[in-house]
């Protein structure tokens, strides 16, 4: 398994892509199924990812993205959307911890209250 340090050192930003390289919908699905395991603030899973591989749709994204040329040559464009209402799920998300006794009623109520206050 690759270490975190190796991953960070190997990562590069790309601005030029080979338009002949494609990525399949299955490969994208596999990647995004793994992303679901990544932690998020308060476990709310705010981010939603929408892959765009259709050339016509990529042209629309190209226009919306200030005509960045890399949008047209990339295998896929990933639109990252944030759920501004995700905090409404803090109660149901934490009910499992409450029912298992990981947190008590006071901690549950404080968590729901503080997360809600932070977002409203």
What role is predicted for each listed range?
Residues 1-120:
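Acidic, surface-exposed loops and disordered segments
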């Amino acid at each position: 398994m690759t270490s975190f340090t190796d991953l960070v050192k190997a990562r590069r930003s790309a601005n030029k892509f080979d338009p002949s390289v494609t990525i399949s919908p299955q490969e994208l699905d596999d990647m995004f199924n793994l992303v679901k395991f990544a932690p998020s603030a308060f476990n709310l899973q705010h981010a939603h990812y929408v892959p765009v591989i259709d050339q016509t749709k990529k042209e629309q994204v190209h226009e919306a993205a200030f005509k960045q040329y890399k949008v047209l040559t990339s295998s896929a464009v990933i639109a990252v959307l944030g759920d501004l209402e995700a905090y409404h799920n803090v109660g149901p998300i934490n009910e499992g911890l409450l029912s298992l006794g990981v947190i008590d009623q006071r901690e549950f109520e404080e968590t729901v209250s503080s997360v809600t206050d932070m977002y409203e």
